[in-house]
Amino acid sequence: MAGSGCAWGAEPPRFLEAFGRLWQVQSRLGSGSSASVYRVRCCGNPGSPPGALKQFLPPGTTGAAASAAEYGFRKERAALEQLQGHRNIVTLYGVFTIHFSPNVPSRCLLLELLDVSVSELLLYSSHQGCSMWMIQHCARDVLEALAFLHHEGYVHADLKPRNILWSAENECFKLIDFGLSFKEGNQDVKYIQTDGYRAPEAELQNCLAQAGLQSDTECTSAVDLWSLGIILLEMFSGMKLKHTVRSQEWKANSSAIIDHIFASKAVVNAAIPAYHLRDLIKSMLHDDPSRRIPAEMALCSPFFSIPFAPHIEDLVMLPTPVLRLLNVLDDDYLENEEEYEDVVEDVKEECQKYGPVVSLLVPKENPGRGQVFVEYANAGDSKAAQKLLTGRMFDGKFVVATFYPLSAYKRGYLYQTLL
């Protein structure tokens, strides 16, 4: 899908036209050496979700950087157009070109806007590590994405925490940034992966390329499994492992280091059944890429059969269209039908200030007794409500607002979260 061109100055304007619509540029989300990403919203359609505008070749980029930006755009566009339709891969809405001058085109991708990244989740975990529910959710979603793109012949080649983002609308993690991706058997990128998440064979290939030498073999989809193994180990341990995986100790016996990390965590919380995760991670981190477990096979790990429950921190950090309000109703309201109906109506009226409420549930019995579940039409309204309702006073009590998985809510599964 191609859009019409338009002219920009040194900074993007507040509004731009693409695909026959007017878009408002609201804020910059991030920038790198060859691209910047902005939050945009379609004007005249307040119900439409915001998007992410990825602009390659920012103003002032010339020479090798300009060539790299153009190359990255072509790589990412080709991969995303081929891989569209999978729930764990970022959605591409369209492609268009803007012009700073007649000879300086700037390519743009319009993508779905996603939420928190795994990198941010690791920061929030404060070196304690993520919950097993979070790790399982992330591992399954990323493996589903990898199984699909590997089946299509693609290698992502830059899997890292910053490139795994949560989708509030789809309630899953998604892969982004396919600028280094390549077709297996046709590796046209010399330097792949990010330091700390780079597979041994990619490390060797990069070193040879820097020395002007050609590698005998190309990297395969196994490099993505290595990266995921490191990511999962970081999520479990709460530690960045860049220096660990480059150490001589790791190269001598990585299995023993993984065992030590899991043993140390078990001392803190002996109730965590973590050995299946340990074995899964080990199967991804073989130095020999031919021994690494493929993504499709990894999805059959016993780790994914364990029914973990989320911690309350998980439900605060991962937005969904469903809001859960705690500390609102006490037993007196639940046991008096008239008072119960009055307070439920009051809560619904307050929640509707932030967007259309699809449904509202206040269970009188466990599980979920006294909790308020509010389903909004979209996650944007739910996020606004969560931000503004948390800490509010209701009937003399401070309200605690978390999100809640829409899939579980629809099934009537009101599990007890862990503190």
Curated annotation (Swiss-Prot):
Catalytic residues of the enzyme? D158 (proton acceptor)
Protein kinase domain boundaries? 23-304
Keyword Transmembrane helix found? no
Q: So what EC number does this one have?
A: 2.7.11.1
Instruction: Describe the reaction catalysed, as an equation.
Output: L-seryl-[protein] + ATP = O-phospho-L-seryl-[protein] + ADP + H(+); L-threonyl-[protein] + ATP = O-phospho-L-threonyl-[protein] + ADP + H(+)
Q: Where in the cell?
A: Nucleus
Keywords linked to the UniProt accession: ATP-binding, Kinase, Nucleotide-binding, Nucleus, RNA-binding, Serine/threonine-protein kinase, Transferase
Molecular function (GO) terms listed? ATP binding; protein serine kinase activity; protein serine/threonine kinase activity; ribonucleoprotein complex binding; RNA binding
Q: Look up the domain of life of the source.
A: Eukaryota
Listed InterPro entries: Kinase-like_dom_sf, Nucleotide-bd_a/b_plait_sf, Prot_kinase_dom, RBD_domain_sf, RRM_dom, UHMK1
Q: In which tissues is it expressed?
A: Widely expressed, with highest levels in skeletal muscle, kidney, placenta and peripheral blood leukocytes.
PROSITE patterns attached to this UniProt entry: PROTEIN_KINASE_DOM, RRM
Q: Where is the RRM domain?
A: 324-406
Principal location: nucleus
Q: Name one GO biological process term.
A: regulation of protein export from nucleus
Chain sites annotated for binding ATP: L29, G30, S31, G32, S33, S34, A35, S36, V37, K54
GO cellular component, alphabetical, reads: axon; dendrite cytoplasm; neuronal ribonucleoprotein granule; nucleoplasm; nucleus
**What protein family is recorded?**
Belongs to the protein kinase superfamily. Ser/Thr protein kinase family.
Q: How does it assemble?
A: Interacts with stathmin and CDKN1B/p27Kip1. Interacts with PAM.
This chain's function reads: Upon serum stimulation, phosphorylates CDKN1B/p27Kip1, thus controlling CDKN1B subcellular location and cell cycle progression in G1 phase. May be involved in trafficking and/or processing of RNA.
This chain's protein is named Serine/threonine-protein kinase Kist
Native source species: Homo sapiens
Gene name? UHMK1
